[in-house]
Amino acid sequence: MLLARMNPQVQPENGGAGPGSEQPPRKRKEVLVVKERNGVQCLLASRDGDEQPRETWGKKIDFLLSVVGFAVDLANVWRFPYLCYKNGGGAFLIPYTLFLIIAGMPLFYMELALGQYNREGAATVWKICPFFKGVGYAVILIALYVGFYYNVIIAWSLYYLFSSFTPTLPWTDCGHAWNSPNCTDPKLLNSSVLGNHTKYSKYKFTPAAEFYERGVLHLHESSGIHDIGLPQWQLLLCLIIVVIVLFFSLWKGVKTSGKVVWITATLPYLVLFVLLVHGITLPGASNGINAYLHIDFYRLKEATVWIDAATQIFFSLGAGFGVLIAFASYNKFDNNCYRDALLTSTINCVTSFISGFAIFSILGYMAHEHKVNIEDVATEGAGLVFILYPEAISTLSGSTFWAIVFFIMLLALGIDSSMGGMEAVITGLADDFQVLKRHRKLFTFAVSFGTFLLALFCITKGGIYVLTLLDTFAAGTSILFAVLMEAIGVSWFYGVDRFSNDIQQMMGFKPGLYWRLCWKFVSPAFLLFVVIVSIINFKPLTYDDYIFPLWANWVGWGIAGSSMVLVPAYIVYKFFSTRGSIRERLAYGITPASEHHLVAQRDIRQFQLQHWLAI
């Protein structure tokens, strides 16, 4: 492939004419051109002559591992298996796979192509439709919110890992300083009581449950979100270590993060395989796996099954956080992002499915040991990985080894996902503000330190309430809304046909009709459906038996609204900050920056019916 450099006279972004345009001093532009095998020359990048060229991944595998590492996170382990079990087992795979094909993969593909072609972060990528730049700011803010509490979950895993380096795991028995007088060894409990009155997984007084809630969280010392107390020094130290690891993984950009993921993205698969092989040899494991895979097609008649499948496929793939756009922006221009989208999204979903075998083999073992039904031990979320699984491990031969291995896996799953979220923030803002790009290391430190400071609220004695609030509202309806606007902005305002031409310039072929129809109709409809359902199904926030006060719910909606409001707010700002008539302001707002000179010539594609009908 031939790489050539040219230095033509490039027109300013606003075209230099018309009432809505500005005329900044002309700068020399450097255009990189790739000459493909068929002789067609494609634009690789355009930048000011005094700017540094955009870095790229050291190797293609660095990019793939980064995407897989981000998408495959803790939810693959603690949420999907339980959803599959409670929604008809194998039958749940039907709506899950359907939504993967018609919505998950198309959105995944769209974000990779968008970032790779424009070589920009989540905010500046909207030079394709300036009015929608607020969408970029919204997803950056959401990614920042997630960083506030996600790092705390990683810190919990690190604390558990340190606690595992003992001959006897601290959650094996009672008698520790954190245990209550009610602490009871589960082996001594009456199984009929567990089976008839409460789920085993919700039983509060087992050593594992008390270690988590009293030894780690110190939840018993808080009466609610209004009484969170001070940060706990043990978790504070763990959080500091996590933030330091994240900082040094990101401070030099993808050159360093691309190497870290060789460990963090591959290690979980090795550990998962080891846990699976050992798990299926345990007594009762087959019962757990049978419960996981049982097929109940009648459950497909229930709307909740389809809703769970839709929301899980969306959040599992991680579209909308600006991460995929940021990662793809460091690809080579002619990289085959179509193949990457299919490969990485498939790996993510297959991982979710396989992890269910490792989880339910252990749950079957737990049910067998305590002579209860599978439904009495099956659960999701933090209770699964910080109570049930550790308790099961404590009963195994060589429990210390298995605990260390398991929590190393959780650490790896969390670290690379958190790296992705922070990279979205750093790349998104650094591309928008050149001063931040010139001082990337300092900016990376500022982002890391900022997330650390806000995370302090989540490691207090009532921190779990703050974490639950953020987890529910920071990236719930708001991220669904942001991706809906992203899909509309790309498919309708920028245009599916133009977007397809961009992809053809990169890879030499246009997306098929199937992808174009999904982008324009199916994916937006899917997202609209999920947004509406998330609002309709909203219930006042709770944590176990604790009901959050009304004001806490309003604070949560304020957090959600703070990101969503950026979308219309930026449209209003852009409209009133642009000079010209109403028609001209609208035209400049929905026309790609590179075509603003056409607006001055009144050649406005978006004002023609053909633009909106094109596929």
UniProtKB/Swiss-Prot annotation:
Catalytic activity: (R)-noradrenaline(out) + chloride(out) + Na(+)(out) = (R)-noradrenaline(in) + chloride(in) + Na(+)(in); dopamine(out) + chloride(out) + Na(+)(out) = dopamine(in) + chloride(in) + Na(+)(in); dopamine(out) + chloride(out) + 2 Na(+)(out) = dopamine(in) + chloride(in) + 2 Na(+)(in)
Binding site for dopamine 2: E380
Molecular function via GO: dopamine:sodium symporter activity; metal ion binding; neurotransmitter:sodium symporter activity; norepinephrine:sodium symporter activity
Cytoplasmic side: 1-60, 115-133, 253-255, 331-336, 427-441, 491-520, 568-615
Residues holding (R)-noradrenaline 2: Y85, K86, E380
Name under which the protein is recorded: Sodium-dependent noradrenaline transporter
Positions of the UniProt region annotated as Disordered: 1-28
Extracellular membrane side: 87-90, 165-231, 281-304, 361-400, 463, 544-546
Main location group: membrane
Positions annotated to bind dopamine 1: D73, A143, F315
Activation and inhibition: Inhibited by nisoxetine, oxaprotiline and desipramin.
Record's keyword terms, sorted: Cell membrane, Cell projection, Disulfide bond, Glycoprotein, Lipoprotein, Membrane, Metal-binding, Neurotransmitter transport, Palmitate, Sodium, Symport, Synapse, Synaptosome, Transmembrane, Transmembrane helix, Transport
Quaternary context: Monomer. Can form homodimers in the cell membrane; homodimerization is mostly mediated by cholesterol and lipids, and regulates neurotransmitter transport activity. Interacts with PRKCABP.
